[in-house]
């Protein structure tokens, strides 16, 4: 056979092999002796119809959890500067606590009554800001998330609550910080659970707005079931699916044993990510202070997850470490100097 013919046959064979390789693109091949096996891509898990209606409804109505406004927090200083006719402060603490001292002009509305108050007692959008105040900023963050999801885009949670407003208030933050479990921190990277379905909501509704309405109001009366203490979690961390809602470098420096990192700004409202949160387990969400995790918990509970926010976040179990690494890791450890001395009235 001539060199030209050999070259022609070589080109033809090479082309055929190239075509075969191109046709198999996107599939993983494994050579086993003379046998080539092909692995198909994992089958995508569909979510139930009501969960799909709800997530599509929220995405079409502002997609709050993936907006710049999430989470909607305001610190004491800008809150104080904003006080006036165009700012309404809604204090959600118990009436007997409210009477002992509150921000001037504040109204006292407990969390279960918030939806009715916003719908019937005020015209919310006449205000530039509506600031929710509680004891430590934990419950007000949860309630703010729910109100924001309802479309009230001018609601904010007072960071640190009344504990950060005036030193004479009952300082829940001073009582909530601890370094008790620093020696138990883990640096292992844990993987997310396999994808599965969202929780079944069973509202019987067939439109996204209807599913949302059926789910959102009861959550205002369920906050007591939406929180958990560090002592409880560290006693049996294996009982929970623990979500670390922090930057990767903060996760890597030490986290609750078994905790899995979920990316802030890359989890909520994203079906593939939320599918890895087990529908049949108790979920614990934590961050640095408990504020962000309260927002996340409210959203997850809307979808039927048995989620709980860890009160005071990392401050509740690794406070000393947060202070030591504050500069390098940009932690937010609570200090008594974080509490301002703004006026209160009775």
Name these PLM-found stretches.
Residues 77-85, 232-236:
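A short acidic-Thr-Gly-centered motif at the start of a beta-strand
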Residues 23-73, 99-128, 140-225, 251-282, ...:
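Rhodanese-like catalytic fold shared by cysteine-dependent sulfurtransferases
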Residues 10-20:
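Bacterial N-terminal signal peptides
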Residues 133, 286:
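Short, surface-exposed ligand- or partner-binding patches at beta-edge/loop junctions that are enriched
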Residues 38-48, 85-98, 239-251:
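Short, compositionally biased "basic patch" segments
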Residues 88, 129-131, 241, 282:
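Structural motif
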Residues 79, 88-93, 106-109, 241-245, ...:
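Short hydrophobic beta-strand that contains or immediately precedes a catalytic carboxylate
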Residues 1-11:
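Bacterial N-terminal signal peptides that target proteins for export
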